[in-house]
């Protein structure tokens, strides 16, 4: 039991962006990578030719071209990093200080340049919270302080590597969230229960409950302590089953219980069990590479099934 409590503590600390917070905490490399790639995923155009241009610019930290696509991508990132509060309609310069203090011995940024960046953000007064007005207000600051921003938000190879090396509990790049959670919850213990869980059996064990807790938080299925139905619906949409949205919402709204395992059980015991398994498996594949869709990959059911079978065989034999 002690091992389970320690494992759960590690999970809640390392997948920190999705835990219930009493106060804001600095963003980890996993969190900033999720924010940037999710905003790219949501705002990149479908056209492959123009898509390539945006990706090349944004990955080089260039907020170009100056058009509606880049403007809304910029707003998405500012809100994701919580540098801008969409509800209060104001910038949050204090976030810059908190982010720096947390990683000041690892990110390579100096106190002086961080203070200047914070001051520049503090002085911003956008005409409105529209994509265009936020972009026009922030763009000059970005151009002046882009190198500071990269250091603060783990956008340099060297800085990110130092952070990862300093904390073995962080989810690694190219590591699926499911593998990460299995490692921290199960370790080398109770492999039978873990493999039954991989086969979508509801064992009810403490380990599986903690495993689902870890996965739901990491997938952002939990937001501000509550079930994030929008995120789950989004995963159904990615397997081309957006038509099931009303059913998903009904199942989760009617579900008794408050723990992630309860919601997971309701989906597994529902009439859309098989579709949920497909959506969950596809999210597992994508969780190993947050840029999976940005790179142009699309849903292929047989490819996902083959990948999951490969992983299960490796893990469970």
Swiss-Prot record:
For molecular function, the Gene Ontology terms on record are: odorant binding; toxin activity
| UniProt binding sites for serotonin | 182, 264, 281, 284, 308
One GO biological-process annotation of the entry reads: sensory perception of smell
Is Iron among this UniProt entry's keywords? no
Where does the UniProt annotation locate this protein? Secreted
- What range does the record give for the signal peptide? 1-20
- InterPro entries recorded: PBP_GOBP_sf
Give the record's keywords alphabetically: Disulfide bond, Hemostasis impairing toxin, Platelet aggregation inhibiting toxin, Secreted, Signal, Toxin
Q: Where is the chain membrane-spanning?
A: none
Gene Ontology cellular component terms for the protein in this record: extracellular space
Tissue expression, as annotated, is:
Female salivary gland.
Task: Locate the residues binding thromboxane A2.
Answer: 58, 73
Classification via CDD domains: PBP_GOBP
Q: Which residues are connected by disulfide bridges in this protein?
A: 39-76, 72-131, 181-214, 195-316, 255-266
Provide the domain comment: Lipids and biogenic amines bind independently through different binding pockets, with lipids binding to the N-terminal pocket and biogenic amines to the C-terminal pocket.
The family line of this record is: Belongs to the PBP/GOBP family.
Task: Give the protein's function.
Answer: Modulates blood feeding of female mosquitoes on vertebrate species by binding and sequestering different mediators involved in the host response, such as biogenic amines and eicosanoids. Binds serotonin with high affinity. Binds tryptamine, octopamine, dopamine and noradrenaline with low affinity. Binds leukotriene C4, leukotriene D4, leukotriene E4 and U-46619, a stable analog of thromboxane A2. Does not bind leukotriene B4, adrenaline, histamine and ADP. Inhibits platelet aggregation induced by low concentrations of collagen and arachidonic acid but not by ADP or adrenaline.
Provide the protein name.
Answer: Long form salivary protein D7L2
Q: Which organism is it from?
A: Anopheles darlingi
Q: What gene is it encoded by? A: D7L2
